[in-house]
Amino acid sequence: MTKITRVGSASPPDGGWGWMIVAGCFLVTICTRAVTRCISIFFVEFQTYFAQDYSQTAWIHSIVDCMTMLCAPLGSVVSNQLSCQAGIMLGGLLASTGLILGSFATSLKHLYLSLGVLTGLGFALCYSPAIAMVGKYFSRRKAFAYGIAMSGSGIGTFILAPVVQLLIEQFSWRGALLILGGFVLNLCVCGALMRPITLKEDPSGPEKSHDRDAQREDCKQASPYSPLTKEWTETRLCCSLQQGYGFLLMSDFVVLAVSVLFMAYGCSPLFVYLVPYALSVGVSHHQAAFLMSILGVIDIVGNITFGWLTDRRCLKNYRYVCYLFAVALDGLCYLCLPMLQSFPLLVPFSCTFGYFDGAYVTLIPVVTAEIVGTTSLSSALGVVYFLHAVPYLVSPPIAGWLVDTTGSYTAAFLLCGFAMIFSSILLGFAKIAKRMKRTQVPFLVKDSDPKLHLWTNGSVAYSIAKELDQKDEESLAKARTGCNLT
């Protein structure tokens, strides 16, 4: 069977079948991120049925989130080696199998492996290839296409949260997991929509491709143990790593990475413990599930409106500050949460936290681009999202241990709130220190020799200027006449 490749124009079509790709990615985000959020609705059911404490039960949600983030590069590798369609279909089968096997679990360890590892691995194989495919079909309207595709997370949470609660009441948690397993099989349909596209190459493309093939053949014919081949390969590998991941040595990026660890630690436990906390203060099951729905839909509003606002001319130069503001406000919401012990008070909390959660998630790529530049943005974002994996894994169990130890949610929520506030303060101090360092440079230049105003490379350039001053004027005149004659 021959593989059919579709050849388009030299640039992405920005429409056509691309809108089906957007629809497919929209459904993928519903079946992955929204379903992951709704697993927290099963928390009380798992805890009651297996008679386990908070920390042990929280590992289920942590493993799903961690596997989805940790194995995202594996999803890219599978889709590149096979195809995007095959990768997403395989991920859909694995995720559905994990949910179905989870419905027959007899212990939490079975849920760790089935609902945690297997389902999380399936989500990882689907999530990153679907997002990458949108970028292949869109160029000018890429941001708008991504806005529609990524909104599936919030919309899916808004719809699925009350539906999952209803399924649990009607069919128990086992029946609800079984039905979710069938629902997640729609990922295979989404994978079928991801039709590959091959863009026309430039006229010089075939020659370049031919040259690359010739070089590849020469490398194959060369002995792998040749010292020259080995030295060239090692040099090329070091240069490519330095160009692709040189930002890891930047102090600003190191500060961002540390702040992301604290931010990810703070934001994750709420999606696990909001429903159990609401139930513990006397809120009904339907109202607790509705709080998750509110959180999801307001998250979409934060994504769209905050991104639009920071694109305005008045705020465009203050995106970094807006990011810090959003993260800090989510931390303040955490600090206020232990005092909110009724449904009318928890609704404004869900709205506020959901809005600013969507706000700073939108600005993460923007802040990263300001630090590393657009050239290394793709690699830097991969590292930033990879750093979410460990906090997503450990923060819910730590919060659960605090609940078991103290008998209340106060300590867990306060720790999460202070973690997010510290993340914001850390980036803020780094920004202030960098600005103060810049303001000191003009004062140093004013106090130095006036010739430094003409040279930008410091002492080396000044020594060159000094040598030119010591040159004999006659030799310089002869040099000028010689240039004129030639």
UniProtKB/Swiss-Prot annotation:
<dbReference type="GO" id="GO:0016323">
    <property type="term" value="C:basolateral plasma membrane"/>
</dbReference>
<feature type="transmembrane region" description="Helical">
    <location>
        <begin position="148"/>
        <end position="168"/>
    </location>
</feature>
<comment type="similarity">
    <text>Belongs to the major facilitator superfamily. Monocarboxylate porter (TC 2.A.1.13) family.</text>
</comment>
<feature type="region of interest" description="Disordered">
    <location>
        <begin position="201"/>
        <end position="221"/>
    </location>
</feature>
<feature type="transmembrane region" description="Helical">
    <location>
        <begin position="115"/>
        <end position="135"/>
    </location>
</feature>
<keyword id="KW-0472">Membrane</keyword>
<feature type="transmembrane region" description="Helical">
    <location>
        <begin position="289"/>
        <end position="309"/>
    </location>
</feature>
<feature type="transmembrane region" description="Helical">
    <location>
        <begin position="410"/>
        <end position="430"/>
    </location>
</feature>
<feature type="transmembrane region" description="Helical">
    <location>
        <begin position="10"/>
        <end position="30"/>
    </location>
</feature>
<dbReference type="InterPro" id="IPR011701">
    <property type="entry name" value="MFS"/>
</dbReference>
<dbReference type="InterPro" id="IPR050327">
    <property type="entry name" value="Proton-linked_MCT"/>
</dbReference>
<feature type="topological domain" description="Cytoplasmic">
    <location>
        <begin position="431"/>
        <end position="486"/>
    </location>
</feature>
<feature type="compositionally biased region" description="Basic and acidic residues">
    <location>
        <begin position="201"/>
        <end position="220"/>
    </location>
</feature>
<dbReference type="GO" id="GO:0005886">
    <property type="term" value="C:plasma membrane"/>
</dbReference>
<dbReference type="GO" id="GO:0015881">
    <property type="term" value="P:creatine transmembrane transport"/>
</dbReference>
<keyword id="KW-0812">Transmembrane</keyword>
<feature type="transmembrane region" description="Helical">
    <location>
        <begin position="253"/>
        <end position="273"/>
    </location>
</feature>
<comment type="function">
    <text>Functions as a transporter for creatine and as well for its precursor guanidinoacetate. Transport of creatine and GAA is independent of resting membrane potential and extracellular Na(+), Cl(-), or pH. Contributes to the process of creatine biosynthesis and distribution.</text>
</comment>
<keyword id="KW-1133">Transmembrane helix</keyword>
<feature type="topological domain" description="Cytoplasmic">
    <location>
        <begin position="1"/>
        <end position="9"/>
    </location>
</feature>
<feature type="transmembrane region" description="Helical">
    <location>
        <begin position="353"/>
        <end position="373"/>
    </location>
</feature>
<comment type="subunit">
    <text>Interacts with isoform 2 of BSG; this interaction is required for its localization to the plasma membrane.</text>
</comment>
<dbReference type="InterPro" id="IPR020846">
    <property type="entry name" value="MFS_dom"/>
</dbReference>
<dbReference type="GO" id="GO:0022857">
    <property type="term" value="F:transmembrane transporter activity"/>
</dbReference>
<dbReference type="GO" id="GO:0015292">
    <property type="term" value="F:uniporter activity"/>
</dbReference>
<feature type="transmembrane region" description="Helical">
    <location>
        <begin position="383"/>
        <end position="403"/>
    </location>
</feature>
<keyword id="KW-1003">Cell membrane</keyword>
<protein>
    <recommendedName>
        <fullName>Monocarboxylate transporter 12</fullName>
    </recommendedName>
</protein>
<dbReference type="Pfam" id="PF07690">
    <property type="entry name" value="MFS_1"/>
</dbReference>
<dbReference type="GO" id="GO:0005308">
    <property type="term" value="F:creatine transmembrane transporter activity"/>
</dbReference>
<dbReference type="InterPro" id="IPR036259">
    <property type="entry name" value="MFS_trans_sf"/>
</dbReference>
<feature type="transmembrane region" description="Helical">
    <location>
        <begin position="177"/>
        <end position="197"/>
    </location>
</feature>
<feature type="transmembrane region" description="Helical">
    <location>
        <begin position="86"/>
        <end position="106"/>
    </location>
</feature>
<feature type="transmembrane region" description="Helical">
    <location>
        <begin position="58"/>
        <end position="78"/>
    </location>
</feature>
<feature type="transmembrane region" description="Helical">
    <location>
        <begin position="320"/>
        <end position="340"/>
    </location>
</feature>
<dbReference type="GO" id="GO:0046449">
    <property type="term" value="P:creatinine metabolic process"/>
</dbReference>
